[in-house]
Amino acid sequence: MTNSAYPRTDLGADQRGGSPNFPALEAQVLDYWSNDDTFRASIARCDDAPEYVFYDGPPFANGLPHYGHLLTGYVKDIVPRYRTMCGYKVERRFGWDTHGLPAELEVERQLGITDKSQIDAMGIAAFNEACRKSVLRYTEEWQAYVTRQARWVDFDNDYKTLDLSYMESVIWAFKQLWDKGLAYESYRVLPYCWRDETPLSNHELRMDDDVYQSRQDPAVTLGFKVLGGDDEDLVGAYLLVWTTTPWTLPSNLAVAVHPDVTYVDVRAGDRRFVLAQARLTAYARELGDEPEVLATYRGADLLGRHYLPPFQYFYESARNAFQVLPGDFVTTDDGTGIVHIAPAYGEDDMATADKVGIVPVTPVDSNGCFDATVPDYQGQHVFEANAQIIRDLKNQSGSAAVNGAVLLRHETYEHPYPHCWRCRNPLIYRAVSSWFVAVTEFRDRMVELNQQITWYPEHVKDGQFGKWLQGARDWSISRNRYWGTPIPVWKSDDPDYPRIDVYGSLDELERDFGVRPTNLHRPYIDELTRPNPDDPTGLSTMRRIPDVFDVWFDSGSMPYAQVHYPFENDDWFDGFDSADSDKQVDAHYPGDFIVEYIGQARGWFYTLHVLATALFDRPAFKTCIAHGVVLGSNGQKMSKSLRNYPDVTEIFDRDGSDAMRWFLMASPILRGGNLIITEPGIREGMRQVLLPLWNAYSFLALYAPKIGTWHTDVSHVLDRYILAKLAVLRDDLSQAMEVCDISGACEQLRQFTEPLTNWYLRRSRARFWDEDVDAIDTLHTVLEVTARLAAPLLPLITEIIWRSVTGGRSVHLTDWPQANQLPADPDLVAVMDQVRQVCSAASSLRKAKKLRVRLPLPKLVVAVYNSQRLKPYIDLIGDELNVKQIELTDAIDTYGRFEFTVNARVAGPRLGRDVQAAIKVVKAGEGVANPDGTLTAGPVVLQPDEYSSRLVAANPEFTAELPDGSGLVVLDDTVTPELEAEGWAKDRIRELQELRKLIGLDVSDRIRVLMSVPAERADWARVHRDFIAREILATSFEFGEPADSVAIGDGVRVSLLKV
């Protein structure tokens, strides 16, 4: 275990005891790793090992890292460390997400740009150059941050989505989709950001909870007058529609009803209104409590009726418009049961209008403002125009006066409304031309391949991710922007000679354009043009469409684009040897592991899966952790303005990275829950694990700083127990880490620190004082193995402990402990754990009755099944609890009784009506427990999972229950004068031991004592004189009046001299 190049040194000598300065210790480790190049050594030692493929999702480097990155980064460090110790080679290549609107918006902010026209004025080349510089602005800060959190990554071999090689793989992927018929252009209604002047994909609206924000909008109920036709019964009546987007009313081209809904024609004053019968009560204020119903119709009866639109702008030009159409999407949950249709501004609207050949009208420009086709509102932003549109309808002024639409109700409607996840402005829905991936063509296959992925938490597979896949829609991948990978589509500029060319490589571009691009970004790629080969006149030109890819297409291409596949590394990626096509080698696709927060189920996880299915017909990854969200101290989203979270750097400087790592990793957040960051929570993690481990190491360093070796062949029961307990920890940690249950692994480690420090070390203290070799070697072995087991979870503190104990180079260059290295003894573990439970329960009784630990008590009854197995440990229990007599018994029912409860939810489906009879019997206390674990409850027998039990003490004042109802302990708290005297002596022993420490004596130093005792305590002191002397290592112990004395307690004064 030792190495002369790395001699054993007490690395934490100045930090032992009290309160170690963990940040200072961590700084030592980080410096050591840097100088030793330990990370590269950990990779190199596995050069010939099988690989474990980890995909590191690329962050943006134009902003500083936050708690979300910190949390995910810890997981990205823990899993590769564990897999490396298990014998795998795990490359940890860092990547940077550099394209897209996040980068553009940051540059716009820096340059004071407020709209796209300013970008066009400055020039695309200049703007994109500013983006290129901006996206890598904080790389040094990122590297410092990642290094400080003790995360090992390869920055030197990083990839960037702006690299030419990366972008070539991205356009290759699109060309593959095009060749498979899975990419197409279409005119559709999409979520649209008027601030950024580009559409979004539907999955971007579902990534974060805060994309939908509560918003108040004006809602209007409006009547459109029915025109004459073949049926005259409704002429002059008003079709009532309800909308929360009044700005779309100038674009109205139809209304929709549900064919199977019942509608009524009612009279209100001198007007008639048509609406769904189910919505009458909602409009009682306007129509009356019992309006006169003139006629009743099915929705199907209303189809084809024509009406006058609320505005005249498109009345003459729109074909097949202004009629009642069928719509299965129409409901009677709100509104009137009749839906206003503006095809350019609603998905259902466009689909409904398309069926009858209604061509959408689009009077709103790319900035979200009305154009000249609606002169009354020209230049007004749609949200600002709402107020004037409503005023005109109410006052029957302007264009709204022509067709006589009736404004029946104007109200404020509060509802969740989508906002741009990048600029945070409210979106609109708008018909635009976009390029799509035909996800619906292979959606079922995506659902099938999802079953091959292991998800943590497990419910994500068929829950949030699986359900999203089932409803997946075609993905809009084009963005009307500048800084991104260009969509490699060239079109003829003459519609009379149409042609589309799609390119998937630099070679293909060079072949057709005669030049090999060295930069695929705009505007350089836009400059590649050529004559249209299909135009015999030779006048038309092939020009690239101006769009760039959705940034999620970039990141979804990461597995292959990072290695420039298929242009390079195809053997590495696919797992075939180029020299021998029949020889299979390690494939690097799919990846073995990825992790991000749960929102990526509709972001990166989703786009990875889409492209993997479409391109390779397999998943992109085998295992995925989708963790919860980190919240501020007030339970809300973290906010710099609210200052509702502690500064990460301050936590690192005060508590250290391992403390933060433990707090995050041990929490429920890795099982899908959310986590509130609190400083007390971080410190509690230190108290639970870091300090106990450090104190155990300090204990060994104090008593045996230069000795101790690996040793498991021991005879003392406490040594055997802690080694067997360590074997259990090894198995439990291995099981948890194999399934990426990191929080479960943390819990196992936390549970181990209790028996290690509060049982083994405390019960073995005297053996260490005596320099017992077995005890020293056992603790050495436990610390060496525990450091290895905890190394992925606490890489910094374990490095110090392991190197100090062994003298080795690094704990992170060791192997994961094997099962056969440690002696397993499940029987000993079970019985000693029960001994500890007995002691814990009895100690709780002492505490509740305010009986100090050093006061002896006469008797403890331990009532448990198979109580005799505790007999060898009676002395240990008595000594631990300071109780004179331990009585063992199997007669639990003498001291308590079991109360049973039927689990009706589990038992009901099997028992039917009999479950009620069982409940009645059990409530009456007549249930009978059977040896096989079943419970007889009257006419039925309940299985173990169909009921629960609770052990209730007969005399709770003196009785405590053991965990899981396994037994009871009953404490006799009678205190005799003899017991009180012994307790007094033990109190003085503790005070004298503290005095020894105070004056700086070594634990082995002998002393002489002169003690002055009050007269009423003199007899107690004489009786227990030898006992006190022996415990404090006094070779001389006399009574008298010391000249130079110290008061220690209960009127006692002493003088103490080293021999």
Curated annotation (Swiss-Prot):
Residues engaged in binding ATP: 640
SUPFAM superfamilies associated with the record: Anticodon-binding domain of a subclass of class I aminoacyl-tRNA synthetases (SSF47323), Nucleotidylyl transferase (SSF52374), ValRS/IleRS/LeuRS editing domain (SSF50677)
E.C. designation(s): 6.1.1.5
Annotated GO biological process: isoleucyl-tRNA aminoacylation
Chief site of localization: cytoplasm
Xref: PROSITE patterns: AA_TRNA_LIGASE_I (PS00178)
Catalytic reactions on record: tRNA(Ile) + L-isoleucine + ATP = L-isoleucyl-tRNA(Ile) + AMP + diphosphate
UniProt GO cellular component terms: cytoplasm
Motif extent ('KMSKS' region): 637-641
Motif 'HIGH' region in this chain: 59-69
Cofactor: Zn(2+)
Enzyme class: ligase
UniProt similarity note: Belongs to the class-I aminoacyl-tRNA synthetase family. IleS type 2 subfamily.
UniProt free text on domains: IleRS has two distinct active sites: one for aminoacylation and one for editing. The misactivated valine is translocated from the active site to the editing site, which sterically excludes the correctly activated isoleucine. The single editing site contains two valyl binding pockets, one specific for each substrate (Val-AMP or Val-tRNA(Ile)).
HAMAP family the record matches: Ile_tRNA_synth_type2
Protein name: Isoleucine--tRNA ligase
